[in-house]
Amino acid sequence: MEWNDAPQLDPRAVQATSVSAQDENASSQEPQALKITAASSNPKMFTLPWELPLSQWPADLFVNLPRGISRHVVRFVHVGDEVYAMKEITRQVAEREYELLRRLRKLELPTVTPIAVVAGRHDANGEKLEAMLVTKHLKFSLPYRALFARTLRPDTAERLIDALAVLMVRLHLSGFYWGDVSLSNVLFLRDADAFSAFLVDAETGDLHGSLTEGQREYDIDLARTNIIGELMDLSSGQLLPTEVDEISIGNRLVDRYHSLWSTLTDVDKFSPDEMWRIERRVNRLNELGFDVDELEMKTSEDGRRVLVRPRVCLLYTSPSPRDGLLS
């Protein structure tokens, strides 16, 4: 690669490094020089004004896209031909969220794509600046507030909740404990008359082999509380149709989640001459966007009943909330 024709670099980039995310020492201590941790190198990243707080970057770098509510400074930035979302947070949180998003992507779960962690940032006076988590902008996606700012059908809130229920079940089946479920931490893509939901903020999350019922129920209860609050906020800003009942929408998430979870995990019981019901159950799961990895089959003690529990894996394409159960 020829660097002679590269744009002017930040002076600190001379000492900077771009390392693999698998570097065991990557998070051991605060870097003294600019350090970009990424799965693959992108020299254009070094040309950005890392010596400035994100809010003070030149306006011509920014892309005017709808942003959700965040407790951090977040901007969309042109990096070559790509558009990246930049979020200023502490180095430890940035590195943890980056690795977690990478693991979720490897599981083919619907999340934004992590690009890099940028640490070792200092201003012109040598004062430390917060690190940045860089993710790829999800094309055509919108945060929930941007959707409600448009003229939409009165049942938009219900369709968003249905999409969020599917996302939560997918994440929970893979052992992901969210810890901060809300509409603000999700991006939505239109899917004909429905929506697909994507995880955008994994700051408080954690990945386990499996989740306990208590962990799942905590996520569900928190989601209900947050959603009701977010919808009430929209209502106070006159962005929510008057016929929408915020509490009913929050309760809808709980009902949809439990219905889908039951469909995916319950044990079927039937007599040996009703084996056709296995195929119907498998087809039903396929329609919802889940593939059956294997079937666990047992007979009852008296031998009169067959017990079947499917073990599912996730198809890459997101199931539409309008399909079957969530119609």
What are these regions (language model features)?
Residues 121-158:
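Conserved structural core of kinase catalytic domains
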Residues 184-222:
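Catalytic activation segment of kinase domains across protein kinase-like and atypical kinase folds
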